[in-house]
């Protein structure tokens, strides 16, 4: 049922959901682990991305977006988030968004990746009304995340890699030197910024999660978002009672979309 809550109480039950607590064996130090705390059934049709707002969430689907309350009941929709002008340019996909201040930022993607042009749209985070669209020079655009302190935005040129693109939002999205990562992360679907890190969700074979240090680019494996065989999607990183990481994962049967809440220890 939509908005229903399932809680993982023990490590054994976490394994039932194909969510384990993972450790890195290459170092004597204990690495962070993402562990599932609870899980909800997400709103149908909104599987691409998620961002936190004051009284709930914003979810994106391929060509739609909606704001929900804490129980994931839809309270506001934008069924045409891609403006006609950009549809005519081939843009047909909304990715994983982010909220900074009073605005929602969402990547708009067109599928002819070798053109090397994508776009970032800005919306009123409360009403979901479009404010403007900015073109960016990158091949793919599965996510955008904006650091609210610096107003530097992060994305990736391709659907995975070993660097995060950076833009100065205050200077009309002027490109900045990329943040080099110390490992390649494939199939990145979503990202969000919290606690001095960029947190990544992927749709690799295990739907793995990663943390990238904003200062050093050190990239740490955190574990799986679960539902292996399904597709990992967007992520939000906000400290709540339910956890720090909030991740969308499409069920292996394609329905429902799971909204998992993870602590990182």
Regions inferred by a protein language model and the residue ranges of each:
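Beta-propeller domains
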Residues: 57-83, 115
């Amino acid at each position: 049922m939509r908005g229903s809550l399932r809680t993982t109480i023990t490590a054994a039950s976490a394994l039932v959901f194909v969510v384990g607590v993972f450790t890195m064996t290459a170092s004597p130090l204990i690495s962070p682990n993402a562990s599932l705390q609870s899980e909800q059934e997400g709103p149908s049709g909104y599987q691409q991305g998620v961002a936190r707002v004051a009284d709930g969430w914003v979810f994106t689907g391929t060509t739609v977006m909606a704001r929900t309350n804490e129980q994931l009941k839809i309270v506001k929709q934008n069924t045409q988030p891609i403006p006609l002008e950009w549809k005519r340019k081939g843009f047909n996909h909304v990715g994983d968004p982010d909220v900074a201040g009073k605005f929602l930022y969402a990547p708009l993607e067109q599928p002819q990746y070798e053109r090397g042009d994508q776009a970032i749209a800005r919306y009123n985070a409360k009403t979901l009304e479009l404010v403007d669209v900015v073109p960016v020079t990158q091949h793919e655009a599965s996510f955008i995340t904006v650091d609210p302190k610096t107003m530097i935005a992060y994305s990736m040129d391709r659907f995975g890699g070993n660097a995060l693109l950076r833009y100065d939002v205050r200077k009309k999205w002027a490109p900045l030197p990329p943040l080099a990562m110390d490992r390649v992360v494939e199939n990145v679907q979503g990202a969000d910024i919290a606690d001095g890190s960029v947190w990544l969700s992927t749709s690799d074979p295990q739907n793995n999660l990663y943390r990238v240090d904003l200062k050093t680019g050190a990239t740490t494996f955190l574990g799986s978002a679960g539902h292996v065989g399904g597709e990992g999607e967007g992520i939000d990183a906000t400290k709540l009672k339910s956890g720090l990481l909030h991740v969308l994962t499409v069920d292996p049967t394609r329905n429902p979309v799971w909204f998992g809440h993870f602590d990182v220890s």
